[in-house]
Amino acid sequence: MKPTRVPNNPCFSSGPCAKHPGYSIEELKDTPFGRSHRSNLGKEKLAEAIKKTRDMLGLPDDYLVGIVPASDTGAFEMCLWSMLGCRGVDVLVWESFSKGWATDITKQLKLKDVRVFEAEYGKLPDLKKVDFKNDVVFVWNGTTSGVKVPNGDWIPENREGLTLCDATSAIFAMDIPYHKLDVITFSWQKVLGGEGAHGMLILSPRAVQRLESYTPAWPLPKIFRLTKGGKLNKKIFEGSTINTPSMLANEDWLATLKWAESVGGLKPLIQRTNDNLAVFEAFVAKNNWIHFLAETKEIRSSTSVCFKVDLSDEKLKELIKTLEKEKVAYDIGSYRDAPSGLRIWCGATVEKEDLQCLCEWIEWAYNLVK
């Protein structure tokens, strides 16, 4: 029977993700429109975003946080181009974005001493094969496959190389051992539902040391430059951005952090995400026609949850269109490079009740189109 209730928020996209519950444009009323980001007020606003992010995450005291251009992609690229090349590189690939990093390292930077460990969608490469004498490049959560690393146990405390981690769809949703990561990047529009175009860059003291002791052989564009005169440009990590940010997007980020504080901070955010995943675990357990793409529970993402559905590609498209037409779910098709299926965002800004409601609609639509 066709469900009678609909989700309060039908936005289940994996980026940009749903705004937090109760979101209102009123929350942006203190945006310093028309003011320079270099003014005292502008710098204060950006520094506030940096400090509140650091405090919410509980980062080590000696780690630096900065706002950089071009979303998570910009943040991660600037580190690949600025830090790699002085030792071997191990790259872990198991979905589209991690494959993109491997392509940049081998085809754009053209580094020679590179080992690529690749697994198909739904699986992880063998983490035991990683050599931490090399720099290690990986994503914490594979946004396009719904597969994450199980934990940080495979990363040694003492390592010669740097660990560079794209954590954009994991941070604020998963327990991450920051001290095992030298570079951490993410964007505002994922777990907390901020706006696009801005990246956040977190550096360990070891990453800073690399920047100050190694100069790549290739030219670096202005928006990738993290040093001045051989020293780290610390102003980037105090609110003086490389180029002009959107003060409106920054205000929106401050609003998301305020909401995150209101629900209790990091641990409740992680719990909300896990509770959301549990809705689908129950749904998959009682329906034999839908399956997680991730092969095992320990590597199953709790944010970008990916499914295989026992339907032809045409019927699957029909299911997705039906749910969009009914205004119950937007943007839930799998990523263009991934196996056909569903990808449903379960991060902290999504309400559990909306997912429970969505499950009823997916079941109805499946029976309608099959």
Swiss-Prot record:
Binds 1 pyridoxal phosphate per subunit. It is found in: Cytoplasm. SUPFAM superfamilies: PLP-dependent transferases (SSF53383). It catalyses: O-phospho-L-serine + 2-oxoglutarate = 3-phosphooxypyruvate + L-glutamate; 4-(phosphooxy)-L-threonine + 2-oxoglutarate = (R)-3-hydroxy-2-oxo-4-phosphooxybutanoate + L-glutamate. Its cofactor is pyridoxal 5'-phosphate. Keywords: Amino-acid biosynthesis, Aminotransferase, Cytoplasm, Pyridoxal phosphate, Pyridoxine biosynthesis, Serine biosynthesis, Transferase. Its EC number is 2.6.1.52. The keyword Kinase does not apply. GO terms for cellular component: cytoplasm. The modification N6-(pyridoxal phosphate)lysine is found at K190. One of its GO terms (biological process) is pyridoxine biosynthetic process. GO terms for molecular function: O-phospho-L-serine:2-oxoglutarate aminotransferase activity; pyridoxal phosphate binding. Catalyzes the reversible conversion of 3-phosphohydroxypyruvate to phosphoserine and of 3-hydroxy-2-oxo-4-phosphonooxybutanoate to phosphohydroxythreonine. Homodimer. Belongs to the class-V pyridoxal-phosphate-dependent aminotransferase family. SerC subfamily. This is Phosphoserine aminotransferase. It comes from Methanosarcina barkeri (strain Fusaro / DSM 804).
